[in-house]
From Swiss-Prot:
Sites of N-myristoyl glycine lipidation: 2
Subunit structure comment from the entry: Heterotrimeric G proteins are composed of 3 units; alpha, beta and gamma. The alpha chain contains the guanine nucleotide binding site. Part of a spindle orientation complex. Identified in complex with the beta subunit GNB1 and the gamma subunit GNG1. Identified in complex with the beta subunit GNB1 and the gamma subunit GNG2. GTP binding causes dissociation of the heterotrimer, liberating the individual subunits so that they can interact with downstream effector proteins.
Region spans: G3 motif: 196-205
Protein's UniProt name: Guanine nucleotide-binding protein G(i) subunit alpha-1
Length: 354
């Protein structure tokens, strides 16, 4: 009896091959779809990472889009100098030049126009004189004792440029803007043949209840921590150290049953600010048991260990840690490249293709 297949058997074999092929194609397609969740406490740099994705993986911000950030730049600048002046009263710091008190009064009167996207020569002059004052600088140097935008010095030192009538914010100016994220911001881009959907979720406590429905089918979590927060308290709870809050949040995410099979990538962010701050503000403010030196390398490594030690599944779950500066495009590009390689490897493994 011969081994020739009947027409029916041949059709069944072809069908089987087609099903296998379709399954493989579906597997490869699934391996190319990446859902990234950006988590972390408020002001840890999540939204800046999203802006960097637009700069790196899309065409960046058009001139028209940059113009729309002008009002935000002015608002951030005004709010920064106002925060410093208000703190001077609380910290009992006097102006170096007593006549600056008149400028401060004038600033409060003129602030509204600049908040709406106009920076008159009068407002710019007032801010410039105040920023140069020795008392204002002394208060700025004590900014850990009150809430101040990270980009305060960036904008205030560049007032001549941003106060020009022809001013259009640069990509870097846009990266530095601070607007509290409310709700969920979704970004799509393609990189290394992967289709990314990135979700940026508000970090303040009031925003966290909105995270839960993003959890389904997440490929990886990027958890952002601001290294420079080690000596600060929360804007929404002045009793709580920001780093301790971040650790508490990371513990709940890292060991959550939802994320047993999810890659967790830890971005220890604002390394530039941390490197400056650690020279004058000891790590023992946050970790009283810390016995190392207040050098960037040693203090940063200690913080890394504090977070990685929270992982209760060390045998089966790896935390991929990177030190980042979210406002530095080259640094974010380099780190995201490494992150993508990890995602590709883990994705292929999950789809049985590795």
């Amino acid at each position: 009896m011969g081994c020739t297949l009947s027409a029916e058997d041949k059709a069944a074999v072809e069908r089987s091959k087609m099903i296998d092929r379709n399954l493989r194609e579906d597997g490869e397609k699934a391996a190319r779809e990446v859902k990234l969740l950006l988590l972390g406490a408020g002001e840890s740099g999540k939204s800046t990472i999203v802006k960097q994705m637009k700069i790196i993986h899309e065409a960046g911000y058009s001139e028209e889009e940059c113009k729309q950030y002008k009002a935000v730049v002015y608002s951030n600048t005004i709010q920064s100098i106002i925060a410093i002046i208000r703190a001077m009263g609380r910290l009992k710091i006097d102006f170096g030049d007593p006549t600056r008190a008149d400028d401060a009064r004038q600033l409060f009167v003129l602030a509204g126009a600049a908040e709406e996207g106009f920076m008159t020569a009068d407002v710019a002059g007032v801010i410039k004189r105040l920023w140069k004052d020795s008392g204002v600088q002394a208060c700025f140097n004590r900014s850990r004792e009150y809430q101040l935008n990270d980009s305060a010095a960036y904008y205030l030192n560049d007032l001549d440029r941003i106060a020009q009538t022809s001013y259009i914010p640069t990509q870097q100016d846009v990266l530095r803007t601070r607007v509290k994220t409310t709700g969920i911001v979704e970004t799509h881009f393609t990189f290394k043949d992967l289709h990314f959907k990135m979700f940026d979720v508000g970090g303040q406590r009031s925003e966290r209840k909105k995270w839960i429905h993003c959890f389904e089918g997440v490929t990886a979590i990027i958890f952002c921590v601001a290294l420079s927060d080690y000596d600060l308290v929360l804007a929404e709870d002045e009793e709580m150290n920001r780093m301790h809050e971040s650790m508490k949040l990371f513990d709940s995410i890292c060991n959550n049953k939802w994320f047993t099979d999810t890659s967790i990538i830890l971005f220890l962010n604002k390394k530039d600010l941390f490197e400056e701050k650690i020279k004058r503000s000891p790590l023992t403010i946050c970790y009283p048991e810390y016995a190392g030196s207040n050098t960037y390398e040693e203090a940063a490594a200690y913080i890394q260990c504090q977070f990685e030690d929270l992982n209760k599944r060390k045998d089966t779950k790896e935390i991929y840690t990177h030190f980042t500066c979210a406002t530095d495009t080259k640094n974010v590009q380099f780190v995201f490249d490494a992150v993508t390689d990890v995602i590709i490897k883990n994705n292929l493994k999950d789809c049985g293709l590795f």
